[in-house]
Amino acid sequence: MSKAAALSFSALAKRNRRIRAVLSEQREPDRFTFEEVRERFGIPVRKLAYLARTGALEATAEGGSLVVSREALLAYASQSERVLQVRHSSFLKTLGPGLITGASDDDPSGIGTYTSIGALYGLALAWLALYLLPMMTAVQETVARISIVTQRGLSSVIGDTYGKKVLFPLVVALLVANTVNIGADLGAMAASLQLLLPVEFAPTLVTVTVGIALLETFVPYHRYARILKWLAAALLAYVVTAVVVKPDWFSVLRSVAVPHVEFNAGFVAAMVATMGTTITPYLFFWQSSEELEEKKDRHTMGERRAAAVAVELREMRKDTYAGMGIANIVFLAIVITAATVLGAHGITEVSSASTAAAALKPLAGDFASALFTIGIFGVGLLAVPVMAGASAYALAEVFGWKEGLGRKVRQAPGFYAVIVVSLAVGLALNLLGIDPIKALYYAAILNGIVAPILMFFIFRIGSNKKIMGQFTGPWAIRVFGWIATVLMGASALVLVVLMATGAP
């Protein structure tokens, strides 16, 4: 915080404390004109009029003067100080749902996809890391904006706006796809530990699953969110690995800046898979719900939220841009590593992230392989609870259950049951010999179909003034959002056609 900002914060906080102290005295009148508020507390009439117009301060017109009640002024002073605390927090402290959402996008299954396209096509698809960034950001900013403004989760808003009959099949598809992804990620985490330590697969898998379930179920939200933020640091392993393998940086820059497209089934399918891995439904529900969790944790939920919303939207945008930027930098780093090491040595078949880590060892050395492996496990610890949580939030809102990681298990039994069952089924997929990696193909199809439908609803709601009021999304966000929706819809159609024609 700068010196000027610190002084501003100190003065405003002192004013709010004085308002609360004065208004707490019983001898004070119940109502004040704006002129009286200005004289007593130094708030300009123009500022008071703005607060009243935006709904941050409740005021009424009486006898030609604007009047504010003692209760309304007290509520504003209390709310305002909490908003000030958010506004003047350091940038790193304001990072939360957006950062965690972006980091969880690079889950072990996603790492497997990015490694596969890097090994098979080299740097030919590296440009997607740059060109998908504004579209991905537009989607995530809009879902977060909807939750901050409406104070409700995405599933709840879509259900009330378009009907639960429309929403329910989408949520069921989300649950199925998330559970398969959880199974694949748990398996990849256990396999990655086997590359580092002399451990057995099954006991390691069970231990990891139980550990995640206990953390997500019993650790208070504010502590758990802090753990997830630190786990995001595991993504640095991929950036370091990309530097260690010494790629041709001129070729990298050229591939990122200039799009390359091949009109054959395999290349188009790889583009579709990359888009589906990068812009995926569980991220929508997770960030939407975690924005609410953050506001509850900071106590900035309430009826007169216009002043808080303006600040929270600014903080959310910085958080979301940081998270999505990190996600796509890591996507690019993984493609660079796979293209430079695996593809360059003729290794084009990569079935999972753990097999990629094993293949790196003889080609790039122990250090690069160990970094890649640590990244798989660390990001898995972040992504698996995010997927399970996204399923729980979506289903709880459909059925009207109590929800939230800020609640205890006894307060939201249905919500936590979905988390535990999702993890248990993911565990069972591995223990029963069902290959979750193969099942990921069908999960990708589900996600590819569900995503554009959800995005259509998201951007319709995000631009609806009846729902969003003065806080509809900026025009640039709407443009990139609709471009993403059209591209994802077209990708889903291409995927269906490729399947129907039996294309590889």
What are these regions (language model features)?
Residues 171-172, 196-218, 234-243, 411-425, ...:
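Transmembrane alpha-helical segments of multi-pass small-molecule transport proteins
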Residues 145, 149, 167-198, 205-209, ...:
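Hydrophobic transmembrane alpha-helices that form the core helical bundles
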Residues 233-260, 277-291, 457-466, 491-503:
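Hydrophobic alpha-helical segments and their helix-loop junctions in multi-pass secondary transporters
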Residues 135-149, 289-297, 325-355:
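Extracellular/periplasmic helix-exit of transmembrane alpha-helices
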Residues 164-167, 202-206, 322, 367, ...:
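Loop-to-transmembrane helix boundary motifs in multi-pass membrane proteins
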Residues 101, 128-161, 169-183:
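Juxtamembrane transmembrane-helix boundary signature
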Residues 2, 6-10, 14, 29-36, ...:
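Short helix-start
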Residues 113-116, 141-166, 191-193, 298-301, ...:
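Flexible loop linkers connecting adjacent transmembrane helices
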